[in-house]
Amino acid sequence: MERMFTINAEELQARPFVPPTFLVEGLIPQGVSLLCGPSKCGKSWLVLWMAMRICQGLPIWGLKTHPCEVLYLCLEDTFSRLQDRMYRLPDEAPSGLHLCVAAGKLRAGLEEQIESHMAAHPATELIIIDTFQKIRTAHGSGVGVYAGGYEDVSTLKKIADDYGISILLVHHLRKQKDKSDPFNQISGSNGILGAADAAFVMVKERRSQGTVSMFMTGRDLPYQELVLQLTDCVWELLEQKTEDDIRAEEIPEFLHRLVGFLQERREWSGTATQLIEEMGEDESMKYRVVKILGRFQHSFLEPNGIRYATEKTAAARLLMLRRDDSCDSRDGLIAG
């Protein structure tokens, strides 16, 4: 049996590592990424435009690209359809973009075809597979759905890691929507997402809608949300939100008003009803104020110099708020 390799924490901390590399800065990392969206939402337009710009080292949404050759397996299209798309895109057709409309499947010739292409075109650093489903094969009866999806992506990840390249898989979404987590809409098992290095999910509220929301996440990619608009066959960036931006939007306006309320006094104590009345808030807020204060105690109140605690008496539960510009979130305790 092959011995397990380990490294102790002290050695690991001292060892220098090369930072993660990106083909498109902050967008497409080395490894396997998923681009998922509903059918006919413009995914193929997006990846063809990206491929043409990456070949020429042109920026994508203001992000720096690393120029390289690209292999685009457009397995649901024809060469004539691809030609028509390129005519309609504003960029020149680069010679470094190699197009293919028929290829083998995983464990049935695809790996060897990629190896052959890489030998002939070693400057290739991006392979786009459109769509992922077209290269998948059935697994044996002993392989579960999760394991099968994980294995398929892992096979491609090994190729990406061996060559130090990026592979972008175009994939579909389930018809059933999940507004709480758009990544749950990715077609197939969670094993597909679990094995990927990054994932992008395009969501449209209505098919006729001209914009899409793109949700991004990854191992070396911080969560972001983009709003894109298709204009003259090109997806343009309208809005970009980081995780911090999204978190800030979740802060209820009531808390900002509370900060102003406490600027006029060093401390305050009383019931939720009394707080709402003194602040002039809507009466319905009294049913939510305790939950809001508890949820945002460490993430908002303490960074704004407000210490919060509660005390239960025989008559009622009292809320205690005190200004303390030196307060540390590690010291914040709620007395119940």
Predicted regions and their residues:
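Phosphate-binding/switch region of NTP-binding enzymes
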Residues: 19, 34-36, 40, 44-45, ...
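Short, conserved catalytic or adaptor-binding loops enriched in Gly and charged residues
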Residues: 87-96, 189-193, 300-301
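Post-Walker A helix-loop "phosphate-sensing" segment adjacent to the P-loop in P-loop NTPases
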Residues: 53-67
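Helical mechanochemical/support elements of P-loop NTPase systems and associated helical scaffolds
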Residues: 78, 82, 106, 110, ...
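Pre-Walker A (Motif I) flank of P-loop NTPase domains
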Residues: 29-33, 68
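Conserved inter-motif catalytic segment of the P-loop NTP-binding fold
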Residues: 2-5, 10, 17-19, 23-24, ...
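Hydrophobic positions on the alpha1 helix immediately C-terminal to the Walker A/P-loop
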Residues: 46, 50
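DNA transaction DNA-binding modules
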Residues: 228-336
